Amino acid sequence: MLFKRKSFCKIFMVLFICPLVLQAQDDLLSEIDSVPKNQKVESAFKSLKIVNLESTKLAAKGDFYFIVAHRFGFVENGFDDFFGLDNANTQLKFLYGVNEWLTVHIARSGFQETYDAAVKYRLFAQGENNFPVTIVGFNSIAVNTELKEEDYPKLEFENRLSFATQILISRKFSEKLSLELAPTIFHENTLRDILDENNMVISPNPQENTQYAIGIGGRYKLTKRWSFNVDYVAHLNRASESIYKNPLSIGFDLETGGHVFQMHFTNATAMHETGYLGQTVGDWGKGEFAFGFNLVRVF
Protein backbone atom coordinates (compact mmCIF):
# COMPACT_ATOMS: atom_id res chain seq x y z
CA MET A 1 0.00 0.00 0.00
CA LEU A 2 1.56 3.26 -1.10
CA PHE A 3 1.57 6.20 1.24
CA LYS A 4 -0.51 9.14 0.08
CA ARG A 5 0.29 12.53 1.52
CA LYS A 6 -2.82 14.13 2.96
CA SER A 7 -3.58 17.67 4.04
CA PHE A 8 -4.02 16.90 7.76
CA CYS A 9 -2.07 20.05 8.65
CA LYS A 10 -4.62 22.26 6.90
CA ILE A 11 -7.53 20.38 8.45
CA PHE A 12 -5.92 20.64 11.88
CA MET A 13 -5.36 24.37 11.55
CA VAL A 14 -8.92 25.05 10.40
CA LEU A 15 -10.72 22.81 12.89
CA PHE A 16 -8.66 23.32 16.00
CA ILE A 17 -6.06 26.08 15.95
CA CYS A 18 -8.04 28.91 14.35
CA PRO A 19 -11.07 28.75 16.68
CA LEU A 20 -8.82 28.52 19.71
CA VAL A 21 -6.70 31.47 18.61
CA LEU A 22 -9.84 33.57 18.16
CA GLN A 23 -10.90 32.66 21.69
CA ALA A 24 -7.41 33.42 22.94
CA GLN A 25 -7.63 36.97 21.55
CA ASP A 26 -10.68 37.64 23.73
CA ASP A 27 -8.95 36.10 26.75
CA LEU A 28 -5.84 38.19 26.22
CA LEU A 29 -7.80 41.43 25.94
CA SER A 30 -9.65 40.70 29.16
CA GLU A 31 -6.50 39.76 31.07
CA ILE A 32 -3.87 42.10 29.65
CA ASP A 33 -4.04 44.55 32.55
CA SER A 34 -3.90 41.85 35.24
CA VAL A 35 -0.92 39.75 34.04
CA PRO A 36 2.27 40.77 35.90
CA LYS A 37 5.22 41.69 33.72
CA ASN A 38 8.64 40.03 33.93
CA GLN A 39 7.24 37.02 35.80
CA LYS A 40 7.72 33.39 34.75
CA VAL A 41 4.53 31.84 33.39
CA GLU A 42 3.55 28.57 35.07
CA SER A 43 1.48 25.60 33.90
CA ALA A 44 1.20 26.12 30.16
CA PHE A 45 0.47 22.38 30.21
CA LYS A 46 -0.65 20.32 33.19
CA SER A 47 0.89 17.06 32.00
CA LEU A 48 4.32 16.13 30.71
CA LYS A 49 2.82 15.13 27.36
CA ILE A 50 0.08 16.81 25.34
CA VAL A 51 -1.00 13.39 24.06
CA ASN A 52 1.92 11.74 22.25
CA LEU A 53 3.95 14.91 21.84
CA GLU A 54 6.12 16.02 24.77
CA SER A 55 4.94 19.26 26.36
CA THR A 56 7.16 21.98 27.83
CA LYS A 57 6.21 20.96 31.37
CA LEU A 58 9.04 19.58 33.51
CA ALA A 59 8.89 17.74 36.82
CA ALA A 60 9.57 19.83 39.91
CA LYS A 61 12.86 19.22 41.70
CA GLY A 62 12.70 15.95 43.62
CA ASP A 63 9.35 14.86 42.18
CA PHE A 64 9.10 11.21 41.11
CA TYR A 65 6.52 10.19 38.51
CA PHE A 66 5.15 6.76 37.66
CA ILE A 67 3.31 6.75 34.33
CA VAL A 68 1.23 3.93 32.87
CA ALA A 69 0.19 4.39 29.24
CA HIS A 70 -2.08 2.14 27.16
CA ARG A 71 -2.88 2.10 23.47
CA PHE A 72 -5.53 -0.37 22.41
CA GLY A 73 -6.14 -1.78 18.93
CA PHE A 74 -7.92 0.11 16.16
CA VAL A 75 -11.68 0.44 16.60
CA GLU A 76 -12.40 -0.51 12.96
CA ASN A 77 -12.95 -4.22 13.77
CA GLY A 78 -15.92 -3.48 16.03
CA PHE A 79 -16.99 -6.28 18.36
CA ASP A 80 -14.53 -8.79 16.83
CA ASP A 81 -11.88 -7.49 19.23
CA PHE A 82 -14.24 -5.30 21.30
CA PHE A 83 -13.30 -2.16 19.41
CA GLY A 84 -9.60 -2.77 19.93
CA LEU A 85 -9.69 -3.32 23.69
CA ASP A 86 -8.41 -6.89 23.26
CA ASN A 87 -5.16 -5.63 21.71
CA ALA A 88 -3.44 -3.47 24.29
CA ASN A 89 0.06 -2.03 24.02
CA THR A 90 1.46 -0.80 27.34
CA GLN A 91 4.27 1.49 28.40
CA LEU A 92 5.61 1.84 31.95
CA LYS A 93 7.68 4.96 32.64
CA PHE A 94 9.66 6.24 35.62
CA LEU A 95 10.48 9.94 35.61
CA TYR A 96 12.42 12.16 38.00
CA GLY A 97 12.92 15.90 38.40
CA VAL A 98 16.66 16.36 38.94
CA ASN A 99 16.16 20.08 39.45
CA GLU A 100 13.76 22.78 38.29
CA TRP A 101 15.12 22.79 34.73
CA LEU A 102 16.10 19.13 34.15
CA THR A 103 13.92 16.00 33.98
CA VAL A 104 15.01 12.44 33.13
CA HIS A 105 13.05 9.27 32.40
CA ILE A 106 13.38 5.59 31.55
CA ALA A 107 10.56 3.48 30.08
CA ARG A 108 9.65 0.11 28.64
CA SER A 109 7.03 -0.38 25.91
CA GLY A 110 5.35 -3.45 24.48
CA PHE A 111 5.72 -1.99 20.98
CA GLN A 112 8.80 -3.74 19.55
CA GLU A 113 9.76 -4.57 23.15
CA THR A 114 11.39 -1.15 23.36
CA TYR A 115 13.37 0.42 26.18
CA ASP A 116 13.92 4.17 26.03
CA ALA A 117 15.58 6.88 28.08
CA ALA A 118 15.36 10.65 27.73
CA VAL A 119 16.35 14.01 29.14
CA LYS A 120 14.23 17.16 28.99
CA TYR A 121 15.66 20.54 29.92
CA ARG A 122 14.37 24.11 30.00
CA LEU A 123 16.33 26.67 27.98
CA PHE A 124 14.06 29.71 28.33
CA ALA A 125 10.86 30.38 30.27
CA GLN A 126 7.97 32.54 29.12
CA GLY A 127 7.80 35.73 31.16
CA GLU A 128 11.38 35.76 32.41
CA ASN A 129 12.89 39.06 31.22
CA ASN A 130 9.69 39.44 29.18
CA PHE A 131 10.64 36.43 27.01
CA PRO A 132 7.56 35.59 24.87
CA VAL A 133 7.73 31.77 24.85
CA THR A 134 9.01 28.76 26.78
CA ILE A 135 11.72 26.75 25.00
CA VAL A 136 12.60 23.24 26.15
CA GLY A 137 15.03 20.71 24.66
CA PHE A 138 14.27 16.99 24.53
CA ASN A 139 16.64 14.13 23.62
CA SER A 140 15.79 10.44 23.67
CA ILE A 141 17.37 7.10 22.78
CA ALA A 142 15.44 3.86 22.22
CA VAL A 143 16.54 0.22 22.07
CA ASN A 144 14.48 -2.26 20.03
CA THR A 145 14.86 -5.65 21.74
CA GLU A 146 12.33 -7.35 19.46
CA LEU A 147 15.00 -7.86 16.78
CA LYS A 148 16.35 -11.42 17.08
CA GLU A 149 19.77 -12.68 16.05
CA GLU A 150 18.26 -15.81 14.51
CA ASP A 151 16.34 -13.58 12.09
CA TYR A 152 19.24 -11.17 11.55
CA PRO A 153 22.53 -13.14 11.87
CA LYS A 154 24.65 -9.99 11.46
CA LEU A 155 22.70 -8.07 14.07
CA GLU A 156 24.76 -5.79 16.32
CA PHE A 157 23.65 -3.73 19.30
CA GLU A 158 23.87 -0.46 17.39
CA ASN A 159 21.30 -1.82 14.90
CA ARG A 160 18.72 -1.74 17.69
CA LEU A 161 19.13 1.97 18.40
CA SER A 162 17.13 5.02 17.37
CA PHE A 163 17.41 8.64 18.48
CA ALA A 164 15.19 11.72 18.60
CA THR A 165 15.86 15.39 19.28
CA GLN A 166 13.13 18.01 19.66
CA ILE A 167 12.96 21.71 20.42
CA LEU A 168 9.64 22.37 22.19
CA ILE A 169 8.38 25.94 21.87
CA SER A 170 5.19 26.84 23.73
CA ARG A 171 3.22 29.92 24.64
CA LYS A 172 0.48 30.25 27.21
CA PHE A 173 -1.87 32.77 25.63
CA SER A 174 -4.35 32.87 28.50
CA GLU A 175 -5.52 30.84 31.47
CA LYS A 176 -7.36 28.61 29.01
CA LEU A 177 -5.19 28.33 25.90
CA SER A 178 -1.64 27.04 25.38
CA LEU A 179 -0.05 26.11 22.04
CA GLU A 180 3.21 24.37 21.13
CA LEU A 181 5.48 23.95 18.12
CA ALA A 182 8.05 21.12 18.01
CA PRO A 183 10.74 21.01 15.29
CA THR A 184 12.06 17.43 15.32
CA ILE A 185 14.91 15.35 13.92
CA PHE A 186 15.13 11.60 14.50
CA HIS A 187 17.33 8.77 13.27
CA GLU A 188 16.63 5.05 13.02
CA ASN A 189 19.72 2.88 12.66
CA THR A 190 17.64 0.03 11.22
CA LEU A 191 14.76 0.37 8.78
CA ARG A 192 12.82 -2.80 8.09
CA ASP A 193 11.96 -3.78 4.54
CA ILE A 194 8.36 -3.53 3.32
CA LEU A 195 6.69 -6.94 3.55
CA ASP A 196 3.50 -8.43 2.15
CA GLU A 197 0.92 -10.35 4.19
CA ASN A 198 3.11 -13.48 3.95
CA ASN A 199 6.15 -11.61 5.29
CA MET A 200 7.85 -11.68 1.92
CA VAL A 201 9.92 -8.63 0.98
CA ILE A 202 8.07 -6.38 -1.46
CA SER A 203 10.90 -3.88 -1.65
CA PRO A 204 13.77 -2.59 0.46
CA ASN A 205 12.71 0.18 2.80
CA PRO A 206 13.09 3.40 0.78
CA GLN A 207 13.12 5.69 3.80
CA GLU A 208 16.22 7.67 4.77
CA ASN A 209 17.53 6.80 8.22
CA THR A 210 17.64 10.45 9.29
CA GLN A 211 14.17 11.98 9.24
CA TYR A 212 12.65 15.39 9.93
CA ALA A 213 9.26 16.41 11.30
CA ILE A 214 7.36 19.34 12.77
CA GLY A 215 4.89 18.84 15.59
CA ILE A 216 2.05 21.11 16.64
CA GLY A 217 -0.17 20.76 19.67
CA GLY A 218 -2.40 22.59 22.05
CA ARG A 219 -4.38 22.55 25.27
CA TYR A 220 -7.67 24.32 25.92
CA LYS A 221 -8.92 24.40 29.51
CA LEU A 222 -12.63 23.61 29.69
CA THR A 223 -13.17 23.63 33.46
CA LYS A 224 -11.02 23.64 36.59
CA ARG A 225 -10.25 19.94 36.14
CA TRP A 226 -10.89 19.22 32.45
CA SER A 227 -8.97 20.26 29.34
CA PHE A 228 -9.11 19.42 25.63
CA ASN A 229 -5.78 18.39 24.06
CA VAL A 230 -4.67 17.73 20.48
CA ASP A 231 -1.34 17.11 18.77
CA TYR A 232 -0.20 16.32 15.23
CA VAL A 233 3.21 15.65 13.69
CA ALA A 234 3.95 16.21 10.00
CA HIS A 235 6.79 14.10 8.57
CA LEU A 236 8.87 16.27 6.24
CA ASN A 237 10.96 13.78 4.23
CA ARG A 238 8.91 10.59 4.17
CA ALA A 239 9.55 8.34 1.17
CA SER A 240 6.70 8.33 -1.36
CA GLU A 241 6.49 4.51 -1.15
CA SER A 242 6.20 4.52 2.64
CA ILE A 243 3.22 2.85 4.29
CA TYR A 244 3.44 5.09 7.36
CA LYS A 245 1.19 8.01 8.29
CA ASN A 246 1.44 11.20 10.30
CA PRO A 247 0.27 10.78 13.93
CA LEU A 248 -2.83 12.71 14.99
CA SER A 249 -4.16 12.48 18.55
CA ILE A 250 -7.19 14.07 20.21
CA GLY A 251 -8.24 13.74 23.84
CA PHE A 252 -9.02 15.13 27.27
CA ASP A 253 -7.09 15.57 30.51
CA LEU A 254 -8.70 15.10 33.92
CA GLU A 255 -6.81 16.46 36.95
CA THR A 256 -7.62 14.58 40.15
CA GLY A 257 -5.47 15.37 43.16
CA GLY A 258 -2.02 13.83 42.80
CA HIS A 259 -2.40 12.56 39.27
CA VAL A 260 -3.55 13.45 35.77
CA PHE A 261 -5.67 11.02 33.73
CA GLN A 262 -5.38 11.50 29.96
CA MET A 263 -7.96 9.88 27.65
CA HIS A 264 -7.60 10.11 23.89
CA PHE A 265 -7.96 8.67 20.41
CA THR A 266 -4.89 8.30 18.21
CA ASN A 267 -3.73 6.54 15.05
CA ALA A 268 -0.33 5.83 16.66
CA THR A 269 0.36 2.54 18.42
CA ALA A 270 3.88 3.32 19.61
CA MET A 271 4.46 5.67 22.54
CA HIS A 272 8.21 6.28 22.40
CA GLU A 273 9.34 9.09 20.11
CA THR A 274 10.94 7.32 17.15
CA GLY A 275 8.09 4.80 17.19
CA TYR A 276 5.14 7.17 16.84
CA LEU A 277 7.09 9.67 14.70
CA GLY A 278 8.24 7.18 12.08
CA GLN A 279 6.07 4.05 12.36
CA THR A 280 2.45 5.14 12.70
CA VAL A 281 0.27 3.02 10.39
CA GLY A 282 -3.28 4.08 11.30
CA ASP A 283 -5.42 5.99 8.81
CA TRP A 284 -8.11 8.09 10.50
CA GLY A 285 -10.16 8.12 7.30
CA LYS A 286 -10.43 4.32 7.41
CA GLY A 287 -11.30 4.08 11.09
CA GLU A 288 -7.74 3.06 11.95
CA PHE A 289 -7.49 4.87 15.25
CA ALA A 290 -7.45 3.57 18.79
CA PHE A 291 -8.55 4.54 22.27
CA GLY A 292 -5.77 5.09 24.76
CA PHE A 293 -4.96 6.65 28.09
CA ASN A 294 -2.02 7.89 30.15
CA LEU A 295 -2.22 7.67 33.94
CA VAL A 296 0.28 10.01 35.58
CA ARG A 297 0.99 9.63 39.32
CA VAL A 298 3.27 12.02 41.21
CA PHE A 299 5.11 11.05 44.40
Report the location of each language-model feature.
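Cleavable N-terminal export/targeting peptides
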Residues: 1-42
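Structural motif marking the loop-to-transmembrane transition
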Residues: 5-9, 177, 223
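Transmembrane beta-barrel domains of Gram-negative outer membranes and organellar outer membranes
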Residues: 25-154, 161-165, 171-181, 185-186, ...
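Hydrophobic alpha-helical segments and helix-packing faces
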Residues: 158-162, 170, 174, 207-211, ...
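A mid-sequence, solvent-exposed acidic-amphipathic segment
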Residues: 181-234
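Outer-membrane beta-barrel and related beta-rich outer-membrane complex signature
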Residues: 191-195, 242, 275-277
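Charged helix-capping and loop-helix junction motifs
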Residues: 210-212, 244-248
